[in-house]
Every structure is written in C-alpha cells, then in structure tokens.
C-alpha cells in the first residue's frame, strides 16, 4: 500500500486538466461553431461507487449503439455514429442489421490533437479532441471495418463541466451476422463484460473563466462522487487482502492442532488497509477501491501498517484490527496491546478497536465445546487463529451460514428490450448464477429478484439499483450493471452485492466468484452441525454424499490409458463412424426442434466428442463419468473451445457420477432440473456397466431422464462374437510398431467378461462385460426402448470408402479437408493389418424411446 500513498491526489489531476484547458483556449484564435473542442480527463476502471453517486445527481441517462471506424488515411481520427436504443425493437438484432438500420451519411469525425498521460497513473489520461460533422457515404460497403458497441451513459451537466459515466459493451464488427454478435448475447453472457469509464469534460462556453472557478466546480463535483475532497483521494489498483481466511470444515475441527490456537467472533465488516505516517492516516476500504486520507490528532512516531475490518455506526468508523503488519510482531496477542497503547484517540471519526478472544485449548474437545457455545451468541460465526508461528499468517472461519460469492447476470429475452417479468404477485427480474470454473463462467442455477422497494431496474442504462444495504458499510443504495458479483446464502437467497468482488470481476479476467469446488465444499459443510463432529454416523453420511457410491465398479479406480498415446488407423476409422452417427442423429432428420437437442453423455471420458456435438448444433450437454482425471480433461477441452468470443459452445455440465448409481437421476437434476433428454450418447462405455446386477438401475435411470422419441446411441464390441472366443485373440493394428506393441488382444475370462489390452495406448488390461445383441434388445424393450438401427463398423466404412477416396478430395474447407485426408491415410495403413476385421466386430446400436 505504501507505494500508492506517494502518488499525487486526485485534485492534482484536475489541476492538470484545467491547465490543459487554458492552454487549448489560448491557442484557439477564432471559434468555429461547426467544431466542438473537447478537453477531458478520463479515468479508466473507476470505483463502482462513483456510478451510484453520479446517478443520484444525474441530469441525463441514456443508451445507444455506437459505430466507430478508424480511417486508414487519417491517423488519430475516428468516424462515429449512433442509434438510440429507443429506435431498436427487441434485442436479437445482429451487427450487420444494426449497420443497415443507420439513416443518412452524416457521421461525426473526431480528431485527437493531444493526449497526455497522468505521470503516476496509467489508468488516467487527458485528451484534447475536435469533433465535427463529415460525410461517410460508403459505410455499408465497409461494415467489416466498423466497430459496434452498446454504450450506456449516466451524465451530470453542471455550469462549466460535464461528467459522464460510460459502460461500453463490445459487440464486434458491422459485418458479423452470427448469434454471438448481437445485443442479446452481449447482455446475457457473463464473459461479455462492460468497459467502464468516467469522464470530466470542461465546456468551451466561457473562454474567460478563471482557473479557480473551474477547480472549485471540479473539486465540488468530485467530492460528491468520491465521498471526500479530491485532495484526500488517491486512485490505485485493487489491493489484495493481506490475510486469507479459509473455511474450516467442521469434520476437520477435531484434527486441528490446538497449540497457540485462539478463537474470536466474526464480524461482517469491510476489509481495510490502514497506513499511518506521522499525522497522515491513509485508509483503503475495499468496497470503495481507492485510498482516503485523514489527519491524525497527534503525530505518530513510527510508521504503522494495519489490516483491519471497518464498520460504520452513525458517523464513526470503527476499525477492528486483524493484523499489525508494521512494526513486525512475532505474537499476534501482543498486537492487541500495541493497538490500545498507540492508536487510542488519534482521530475523532476513526476508532481503532480489537476483539476479545478465547484460548488456548488443552484438547480438541475443549475447542469444539467453545466453538459451539460461542456460535449460540454470534450472528456471523467465529474466527480461529494461531498467535504465532508459520500458521499465524492464515485465519480460519466457521460460519453459521456458509455463504458463497457468484456472478449474477440478469436474463434478457429475444423480442423484449426489458428483462422484467410480470405475474399475479408483481414484477421481478430473472437471473442466472455462475460459479468460477478455473477462469471460465459455469452456470450454476437461476433465481429471481422481486422489484419491490429494495430493488429497481433502470431500463435505459441496463443497470439495477439495490437499496437498504447494510448500514455498516456506509452505503445505503447501490447502482450496478446487470452483471455483478453477489453473496448468496446456503439456501440460495441473494444476501447482498459484493462491491469489491464486482470490481474484480469487471476489471480483471477470469474471475466469476468462488471456484465451483469451493462452493461445493461450503454447501456440504453446511449439512453438519458443530456437535456432529463426534458422531461417526453423521460424518459417514457426509462422506458418502461427497464420495461416489460405486462399490460394484468393474475395473478398480486408476489410470488405464497412456497420456502420450498416438491414434492409429483403428482409432481414426472408429472416430469416422462416431462422427457420422452423431451427425445423423443430431440432424433435423430426427430432431427438427432446436429446443429439444439436449444430450446426456454417459461415461463421456476425456471429452473427445465435444466438437462433434458442437457441429451437431445441440442446445446443451450433461456429461457424467466416475473418473476425476477424465472429468478434468473434458472440462479443460470444453473451456479451450469455448474461450473465444466468436466460439459460443453449447451449455456443458460435467458431473462425477455413474449410470450404475441410484443417485444418478438426482445428480443430473441438480443441473437440468425437470427437463428431459432427447439424445443419449453411450459410446464405447456400455460394456463397463451392462450386467444383470445393474440392469434395473441403469434402465430406470435412462427411462426417467429421457423424453419420448429420445435416441440412445451405443457403440460396443459384438457380444455374440466375443461369446465364441476360446482363447486369447490378437489383432495386428499398427504394423510400424514393434511386436510387443502393435496389437489389440481380447481374452474371454468367464461367461460374462472379456479382458481387452492394447499396449500402444493402455498401461494395463481392462475388463469389459459381454454385451449380447439379443440381451441388449430384450432389456431395452422391457423399458420401452425399441431398436431402430444396427450395423457393424466395417459395413459403414465399406459404404464410405469410395466417397473418402474420391469426392471428398474436392473439399476446400480446412478442417473438413484434413478430416478426410486423415481417414484416407488410415485406410492405407489398414493394409497388412487386422484393423478392418476388428472393425467388423464393433457394433452400432440405436434405440428410440417409444411414446
């Protein structure tokens, strides 16, 4: 923090702005009414509280689509135009349609004449520009060079200055016509975040105005925005918490080391950094996002740096000291005496206090009893800390309500410009909640905000206003964009917006609240009470809930496949068959309603087929697998493919579950609720589950999760062929590999199982159940699934050889051309191998659920 307090205060920015304005005015000999001279200070990534304060004093609020083109022959110049949102009906409007809706050829030409960086703040600049009208006749022909943005503006026009708070959503280029390039997509997806700016512009209406009057007006308005005179404000980036506080799971309490361990109450305040030097007290309050300076009543001899928690009561700020960072102390208990001796009475509005604590404890039992007693009287929970040693740098918390932070995105619909929903009880907003899945937003659930006295939707700037906030923060109401971070209770109640976390979400990449794994830990911990930690049955219930119930797994848990395996002809041609199968049954031949394309992928593995379903244009996929590593790889693949703005993949959830489990349906219902699937993908995996002891569970799960007409895609080995094996059978599949690696072996080990091993891709053999055709058909028929398609892989390859070797050579699209080239090489590699024979023993089965 000390490196930021040495920076110039905000008042110096205004002095530099006024000096620039006076210099510009003196350089203008004659005023041309057709030109607008603009001198402005722009603050990037402003504190979000300034939006609220400016809205309270605003004279204008509006939104519009801004079109910007940078002419190649005119450096430092841009052409601009705009369409008010009031002239656009509905939000499902593509970029090229917006360009077509522009009227006339008169645009605004803005030329940048001066750009001055603030010396010690890269997020602040001063600009001098000239704006004038210009003709831009062929803009429709050059729409690919036009950038589109949705701009929402909150404006306060004073006597000599104009203050704008702008929120800009990037829409893409004017030539784009994809669904991902539309107003609807920009508003509905949390990855499309607005860029925020605050601009202070001095108007040219009075060239003879004095520097003193301009500074008075700027400082007065800034005092209202920043809640203090600008000379006491220092802008800075977000300062991270010094001390991390981790959730202590209740089942872990009995195992924690009690040496030098103490407990104290947890309060709901604002984390703050306090730096005291001589008579200056610098406070960084995390919800404000900048540093405020106060003057101490006496001079402090040594520099003091504190990490504290602020609560406001009436006009007094109570700062509960959590950690003294300067001077360095070995024992945190000695910090309490230091605060009392050095910081008492140093300011009439800043009161430094410490907490009472309990400890140390002789045993875990004493600790549990103390925690249980303290929780009876505490509103929030308790904090555990070590007074000294390496562990003293981390605090632990046990909360009454394990709250979580998640990203909220209000839901907009196609034909409506507003998200408000009406019912017999009033009006409300629907929103989606997103958790942070390793830097990507993962949809968690939905909710609604009742539009009552506490919440209002501000329709013309795509914001909401939340009132009656916790008074201890010093903020009673808050205006936020329709994308923000909120705190939720364990029972899904939206408690309050998180101002500091919202700024982190808006201004940093890859943050959407708590990680999904953290959220699940919090929710599972909520199911235990403190007193349950000594009851083995209660702990076992929680452990059983968290651990996959799959005691009858065919192969023991472990890694069976090599990480550096290279796919040969067998894998490539099998992939060709799967591609055709998925393309066919995702196509409109079978599913002509886009809303029905919901896929359940059973034992989905590492997600190799994700892209096939993207081109199948499905709406969503829920995948399940019992293996953590497979799920990790599958999620990573999905996130990589869904990373770009142009690549809007279908909604994807990956759950650790097995179709053999009685909890399978309830696990799926956590992400899909009451909808049913229209397509089930069970490729090269049914042979790990299809056994008489699992028939009832498997088929009941399938029946409950699928709608009428649902297609179940199954690929597996021909069980009737496997039944005939008398000894181990080897198929040569890679002639270029040594004899120890070039084969795939199948050995029947009993009446219902075979052992499969491919040394070039597997570290050890895997057992598979024998899936006999008649048995498969009979079991599926008992649960109202009818076989509609069946064929072996070789037949499909034979039917397509002429096309692969012939017409497909005319393909010019890069990925398609490479796909067929790969299959042509695979067919060539089949010579002198048993690949085609082996493919004749691989089967496709397609079942359809009867009405």
From Swiss-Prot:
Residues 1-544 are annotated as: Triphosphatase-guanylyltransferase. Its cofactor is Mg(2+). Keywords: Hydrolase, Magnesium, Metal-binding, Methyltransferase, mRNA capping, mRNA processing, Multifunctional enzyme, Nucleotidyltransferase, RNA-binding, S-adenosyl-L-methionine, Transferase, Virion. Residues 565-850 form the mRNA cap 0 methyltransferase domain. PROSITE patterns: RNA_CAP0_MT. S-adenosyl-L-methionine binds at residues 554-555, 578, 603, 625, 683-685. The active site is at 266 (n6-gmp-lysine intermediate). Its EC number is 3.6.1.74, 2.7.7.50, 2.1.1.56. It catalyses: a 5'-end triphospho-ribonucleoside in mRNA + H2O = a 5'-end diphospho-ribonucleoside in mRNA + phosphate + H(+); a 5'-end diphospho-ribonucleoside in mRNA + GTP + H(+) = a 5'-end (5'-triphosphoguanosine)-ribonucleoside in mRNA + diphosphate; a 5'-end (5'-triphosphoguanosine)-ribonucleoside in mRNA + S-adenosyl-L-methionine = a 5'-end (N(7)-methyl 5'-triphosphoguanosine)-ribonucleoside in mRNA + S-adenosyl-L-homocysteine. The record marks 80, 110, 131, 164, 166 as: Essential for RNA triphosphatase activity. InterPro entries: MCEL_GT_NTPase, MCEL_GT_OB, MCEL_NTPase_sf, MCEL_OB_dom_sf, MCEL_TPase, MCEL_TPase_sf, mRNA_G-N7_MeTrfase_dom, RG7MT1. It is found in: Virion. Pfam families: MCEL_GT_NTPase, MCEL_GT_OB, MCEL_TPase, mRNA_G-N7_MeTrfase. MRNA binds at residues 574-575. GO terms for molecular function: inorganic triphosphate phosphatase activity; metal ion binding; mRNA 5'-cap (guanine-N7-)-methyltransferase activity; mRNA 5'-triphosphate monophosphatase activity; mRNA guanylyltransferase activity; polynucleotide 5'-phosphatase activity; RNA binding. The N-terminus contains the triphosphatase and guanylyltransferase domains, whereas the C-terminus contains the methyltransferase domain. The N-terminus is involved in binding to the termination motif 5'-UUUUUNU-3' in the nascent mRNA. In the N-terminal section; belongs to the dsDNA virus mRNA guanylyltransferase family. Heterodimer of a catalytic and a regulatory subunit. Intrinsic methyltransferase activity of the catalytic subunit is weak and needs to be stimulated 30- to 50-fold by the regulatory subunit, which is itself catalytically inert. This is mRNA-capping enzyme catalytic subunit. It comes from Fowlpox virus (strain NVSL) (FPV).
